[in-house]
Amino acid sequence: MSSTKDMSTVQNATPFNGVAPSTTVRVTIVQSSTVYNDTPATIDKAEKYIVEAASKGAELVLFPEGFIGGYPRGFRFGLAVGVHNEEGRDEFRKYHASAIHVPGPEVARLADVARKNHVYLVMGAIEKEGYTLYCTVLFFSPQGQFLGKHRKLMPTSLERCIWGQGDGSTIPVYDTPIGKLGAAICWENRMPLYRTALYAKGIELYCAPTADGSKEWQSSMLHIAIEGGCFVLSACQFCQRKHFPDHPDYLFTDWYDDKEHDSIVSQGGSVIISPLGQVLAGPNFESEGLVTADIDLGDIARAKLYFDSVGHYSRPDVLHLTVNEHPRKSVTFVTKVEKAEDDSNK
């Protein structure tokens, strides 16, 4: 994963006649549905939206949680306590096949799409490492560089049966010419210590890809924008029954009684909110499409005049957070030569 040292630093605004240059950035959220069990078609769909967003001047394009590979809303995978189900195993095999390696050919293609369209791209994806899946966010630069990734630290509810947990080694905030860019996935946004870690890294463009289309979610996004003094971009899929595989067990029947082709399964709600708590675009609960806003990075300083949660409004003498950024590995192999060298250094 590239470190922020490889990135261009934020350009300092030099005042001219007492007025700072423009700090306006156009940002776009893509609210759309995965093409389930067809990753190439999903990336084709993503590219069309990226081209459209770029043609309208977007400099940053954000996609929802698990867009590539698919958020498995209502999928059963044969899960029940103490029960092993062959049909569930087969479904997981299909889901695993739709996930992508990072890095890998799909990542290379996305990097090229970002380059061709001159945008920063933040993409939700299901990543596979061996036979463990992770809910991941991928970051790309307009130069076609894969910057790195964030793996979801804590899958929610039954997500824990199919996704592994990320660790502290993948919680980046990238210092870019359009602002400091990072992400928290879905209900990670309810983890105050994780949010604090992102604030401490100086996040300015807070991307929140999610599967939560509830109206209550909007309150969380508004709070985070004010608490963090940052722009919040929350991207959620808009999905209808027709977007899912044609099999009744793909959806929990007690959740979705309406099996009509056009019935809404995930209602979106993508939204862009300023550090001052102003809703700049969205929420869109109606359809697939783009949610776009022109943001003024100067609003960050305006907001932090009164409240900076990790700066002048913090009390490190009373409350202090330690973040472990070391990769967490289940197995570490040590050769005899390495062990001998380690022993000689003691």
From Swiss-Prot:
It catalyses: a nitrile + 2 H2O = a carboxylate + NH4(+). The active site is at residues 65, 152, 186. One of its GO terms (cellular component) is plasmodesma. Keywords: Acetylation, Hydrolase. The modification N-acetylserine is found at residue 2. Its EC number is 3.5.5.1. Expressed in cotyledons, hypocotyls, leaves, roots, stems, flowers and siliques. GO terms for molecular function: indole-3-acetonitrile nitrilase activity; indole-3-acetonitrile nitrile hydratase activity; nitrilase activity. GO terms for biological process: indoleacetic acid biosynthetic process. InterPro entries: C-N_Hydrolase, C-N_Hydrolase_sf, Nitrilase/CN_hydratase_CS, Nitrilases_CHs. Pfam families: CN_hydrolase. Residues 25-297 form the CN hydrolase domain. Interacts with DEK3. Belongs to the carbon-nitrogen hydrolase superfamily. Nitrilase family. Can convert indole-3-acetonitrile to the plant hormone indole-3-acetic acid. This is Nitrilase 1. It comes from Arabidopsis thaliana.
